[in-house]
Design a protein with these regions (language model features):
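N-terminal alpha-helical "arm" segments
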Residues: 1-38
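Positively charged, low-complexity intrinsically disordered regions
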Residues: 10-13, 37, 56-57, 257, ...
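Assembly/oligomerization interface modules of large self-assembling protein complexes
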Residues: 23-91, 118
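Acidic/histidine-rich, surface-exposed loop or edge segments in extracytoplasmic proteins
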Residues: 92-100
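Alpha-helical scaffold segments that mediate packing/assembly in large oligomeric complexes
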Residues: 99-181, 189-204
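Short, cationic low-complexity segments
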Residues: 122, 215, 276
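Extended oligomerization regions of viral-like shell subunits
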Residues: 180-272
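Single conserved hydrophobic/aromatic residue that forms the stacking wall/gate
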Residues: 274-286
Length: 286
């Protein structure tokens, strides 16, 4: 029998490159909208103050007269964290095989331990992203007047759409509600595409700019400190890829949370975080 290439390799099939085919994932932005609390406990008591410092009082007094006393409202609420978990089993024999291949430097090999850990991490991250997106794009999450539904000629993808007017009006609504201007605009992939090519947006650009508006230009035009584009996708039961964030835009004030106390991990679960973190959003539905 004539010897074949497989016989020369003793019928082994080495991995000849360091490449591994697989599906990638877009940018996940859940923590940009609902930041994790630096909290390692599964239950926490959160203090909440009233709006006393935003109200006006009659502070005028006669010499020696009584001063105005303002009582601070304090509300303490206890929140618990739900747990999520996933298993990606990997036979011990395969782990040992990869371990020995690495020690013996037998060509390239699959780092199955890393693949399993990355897969589990990505699954948990996508589940978190989906839950946050469902909460943030639900009209029932917001107060009356804080959701703008666009259709037909008002859509940002339409030539007559007015995203600059919409975003600036939404920013003013948030400012009047909480006393702070929104600092973050979260855009789905579709919303970002429509916004960058919108005629009203391009009218703010120099005449020398022929292409779509960049993120930096959009930040200046819309007067928003940060713009994040949500590219994450998920595959449904029909094997169809779908955008996690649909065609939505969410304008919000997101507080900056430092890791006070040196905590470097968080057990916070998306739904609990939304209730824990004080913020105000106005959703713009494209």
């Amino acid at each position: 029998m004539t010897m074949t290439a497989a016989d020369i390799r003793l019928r082994q099939n080495p991995i000849l490159t360091a490449l591994l085919l697989g599906m990638g994932q877009g940018t996940m932005v859940a923590e940009k909208l609902f930041p994790r609390l630096p909290q390692v406990l599964s239950s926490v008591n959160l203090a909440k103050l009233g709006d006393e410092r935003l109200r006006r009082y009659n502070l005028r007094r006669a010499p020696g007269g009584p001063t105005k006393r303002v009582n601070i409202k304090f509300e303490g609420a206890t929140y618990s964290v739900d747990q999520y978990s996933v298993e990606v089993p990997m036979p011990r024999e395969l782990l040992r095989e990869a371990d020995e291949s690495r020690k013996l430097q037998v060509g390239n090999y699959l780092d199955v331990s890393r693949i399993a850990m990355t897969t589990a991490s990505d699954i948990l991250g996508l589940d978190y992203e989906l839950e946050v997106a469902a909460l943030a794009t639900n009209v029932n999450t917001y107060a009356s007047g804080h959701v703008l539904a666009l259709a037909g000629a008002t859509k940002w993808s339409a030539a007559t759409g007015t995203p600059v007017t919409d975003v600036r009006a939404a920013a003013d609504t948030i400012r009047k509600k909480i006393g702070k201007r929104p600092n973050r605009l979260t855009l789905s992939a579709d919303a970002a595409h429509a916004l960058a090519l919108n005629p009203q947006v391009k009218s703010y650009l120099p005449t020398t700019v022929l292409g779509p508006a960049s993120v930096e230009q959009l930040k200046t035009i819309l007067q928003v400190e940060e713009i994040v584009i949500a590219d994450a996708v998920w595959v449904d039961e029909t094997d169809t890829g779908r955008d996690v964030w649909g065609n939505n835009a969410i304008l919000a004030y997101v507080p900056r949370i430092s890791a006070g106390g040196g905590a470097d991990i968080s057990l916070a679960e998306p739904r609990s975080e939304e209730r824990r973190v004080g913020k105000e959003c106005l959703r713009l539905c494209r």
